[in-house]
Amino acid sequence: MPSSREIKRRIRSVKNVAQITRAMEMVSASKMRRAQRNVLATRPYADRMREVMANLTARVVGAARRGTLLEKRETVKSVALLVVTPDRGLCGSLVANVLRRAGRFITEQRAMGRTVDVYTFGRKGRDFFLRTGFAPAGEATRLGDAPKLEAILGVAISAINGFQSGKYDELYIIYSEFINTLVQRPAIKQLLPVESPDISTTTNVDYTYEPGEEEVLNSILPRYVETQIYQAVLESIASEHSARMVAMRNATNNAKDLVRDLTLSFNKARQAAITKEVSEIASGAAALTS
């Protein structure tokens, strides 16, 4: 059984860890609320963009779609995958879930005879693919807790240009979708070719496009895809802070339980030491009187 001094040292160490995890929980809670506000702030723009896209894609059909981001290739030989992960860990199983889903997607695509290029947002995803010998075709790290659109444009434009040049036939993104504080799940979406938004959920507005529908569509399509990527990055950041807050709360609770168990062990060890000392005194006294 460990000595009282050793147990006391462990109790002090665990209490220090609990203070750190508690502080991290509070910081993550604050950052999560800010990340949620960022997600909500971009939704009106994203909703109006989807509305305009639904109206435009309903008007532009047939041959007019060729050579645009709406064009579906007859055969799919090459795919680009954008993987969004945090820069830091300590957020439960969030990173592992996203990377596991990405790995499964890559395996499925290769089984169909397709090549896959990976673009990463976040250090965790980049480091994972580098360790597995799968060097990303593009990467963006240190995006921060409130990244600007410009921070993701380099990778986004590179992937979009790959589709336009014919290098890729499809473009997908995998990220952690923010459901609520306790639930974040890996989500995969097809970015290119752009799928027409559901017009049943949009308002019935008769837009007039200048200089013309096709010109406006060709101009707005890249912005639409960039917005989808930016929204996914913001969702991933909100998910990261939510998962870290929950993970640190669990760590704090576990530390408290461990302190309670160690305190019980400390009391038992101290009681055993006192009993032993009393027994030795009694034995010594008995020896002197005999």
Curated annotation (Swiss-Prot):
GO cellular component term, pick one: proton-transporting ATP synthase complex
Source domain of life: Bacteria
Gene3D superfamilies: 3.40.1380.10, ATP synthase, gamma subunit, helix hairpin domain
Compartments it resides in: Cell membrane
Swiss-Prot/TrEMBL GO biological process terms: proton motive force-driven ATP synthesis; proton motive force-driven plasma membrane ATP synthesis
Membrane topology, as annotated: Peripheral membrane protein
Keywords recorded for this protein, A-Z: ATP synthesis, Cell membrane, CF(1), Hydrogen ion transport, Ion transport, Membrane, Transport
GO molecular-function terms, A-Z: ATP binding; proton-transporting ATP synthase activity, rotational mechanism
Annotated transmembrane regions: none
Entry-linked Pfam families: ATP-synt (PF00231)
Subunit structure: F-type ATPases have 2 components, CF(1) - the catalytic core - and CF(0) - the membrane proton channel. CF(1) has five subunits: alpha(3), beta(3), gamma(1), delta(1), epsilon(1). CF(0) has three main subunits: a, b and c.
Alphabetized HAMAP family for the sequence: ATP_synth_gamma_bact (MF_00815)
Role played: Produces ATP from ADP in the presence of a proton gradient across the membrane. The gamma chain is believed to be important in regulating ATPase activity and the flow of protons through the CF(0) complex.
Family indicated by similarity: Belongs to the ATPase gamma chain family.
PANTHER family named in the record: ATP SYNTHASE GAMMA CHAIN, ATP SYNTHASE SUBUNIT GAMMA, MITOCHONDRIAL
Protein name (Swiss-Prot/TrEMBL): ATP synthase gamma chain
